[in-house]
Each structure stands twice: as structure tokens, then as C-alpha cells.
């Protein structure tokens, strides 16, 4: 039964934590533990023009004009099935984020992380509303170098610096066996 620990999984996008840690989340909830999945980047810019890479991504994934609502519905259903709670934060993923001048910050998935301290601080403030001294935070390792996963990993490191217990998970499918081997320095 529950030991009053709350397990919080930070998910860069809808389905990332479920896809990567669903079996463990299921184990925790079946044992009566409190689990909360917080998706950081689940906002969608309804009024802005999309950059070419976003249009290409939408077409490749056969996403409609406003894909986020269907994806949120799928995520809610997955969380219900796993018997965990969820929060969808309204921040934009890399495809939609712009700088102060209205220019897109990132052109592709593996872009170098920009200085987005204001965004990072806003997200941390929102996360702190869900954290206490008994929680365990699970955060992506970001081994696949997806810019949003790297960003959320930096949030995990900031929470760790603030003395929260943070455990890092392999963010599947961003990491594959070959990228893990390469990351570990064991390439041929």
C-alpha cells in the first residue's frame, strides 16, 4: 500500500512518459501508489502560422489542423487505463516556440538548446505546485537529444539542485540501442 510518496513523471510530450514508463506506472498504481504524469509541452498555437518543419511533421504523422486535442484524449485514456492522474501544461513544443521578435527558435528536432530561462522558470514554478518533500520525480535522460527532452532534462537537474529526489528514465523511442551504445562511448 501507499507510503505517502507521490510519484511524478515528467513527460516532454503527450505519451512520452506513458510510452517509456507505462509498465512501471502500472506497477506503482496496482500497489496503491499515487502517480501523476505531467506533460510539459501540450499547448498548441491556434492562431500562429506554422513553420515548414511543423507542417511537414503534421503531414508525416497524418495530423489534422489542430492535432493536440486528439492526442490529449489519447493521453487521458492511457492514464485512466494505468489508473494514474495527469496534468497537461499549456507550453509549446519546439516546433511552435518563438523568440521575442517572433522568429522560430528551433528549426529541427536536434537543434541546440537555446537560452529559455524565462520559460524554464515558469515551468518550474508550475511544477512546484505539485511537489512536496515526499515526492519522487521521474525525468527523461534525453539520450536521443530531442531538444524538448533535453529541455525537460534540464528542469529535472534544476529540481535536483533544489533537493528534490529525481530519477532519470530512458526516453523511448527517442533512444535506440545504437544511440545508447554510442552515448556510452562503446561504438565500434
Q: Locations of the language-model features?
A:
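Active-site beta-strand->loop->alpha-helix modules in alpha/beta enzyme cores, enriched
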Residues: 1-151, 158
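Short, flexible loop segments at boundaries between secondary-structure elements
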Residues: 161-186
Amino acid at each position: 500500500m501507499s507510503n505517502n510518496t507521490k510519484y511524478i513523471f515528467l513527460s516532454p510530450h503527450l505519451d512520452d512518459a506513458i510510452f517509456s514508463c507505462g509498465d512501471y506506472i502500472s506497477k506503482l498504481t496496482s500497489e496503491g501508489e499515487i502517480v501523476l504524469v505531467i506533460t510539459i509541452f501540450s499547448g498548441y498555437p491556434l492562431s500562429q502560422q506554422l513553420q515548414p518543419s511543423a507542417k511537414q511533421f503534421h503531414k508525416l504523422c497524418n495530423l489534422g489542423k489542430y492535432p493536440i486535442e486528439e492526442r490529449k484524449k489519447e493521453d487521458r485514456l492511457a492514464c485512466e487505463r494505468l489508473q494514474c492522474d495527469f496534468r497537461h501544461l499549456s507550453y509549446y513544443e519546439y516546433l511552435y516556440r518563438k523568440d521575442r521578435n517572433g522568429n522560430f527558435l528551433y528549426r529541427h528536432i536536434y537543434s541546440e538548446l537555446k537560452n529559455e530561462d524565462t520559460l524554464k522558470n515558469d515551468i518550474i514554478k508550475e511544477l512546484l505546485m505539485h511537489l512536496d518533500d515526499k515526492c519522487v520525480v521521474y525525468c527523461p535522460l534525453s539520450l536521443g537529444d530531442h531538444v524538448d527532452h533535453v529541455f525537460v532534462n534540464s528542469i529535472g537537474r534544476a529540481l535536483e539542485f533544489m533537493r528534490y529526489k529525481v530519477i532519470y528514465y530512458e526516453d523511448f523511442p527517442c533512444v535506440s540501442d545504437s544511440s545508447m551504445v554510442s552515448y556510452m562511448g562503446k561504438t565500434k
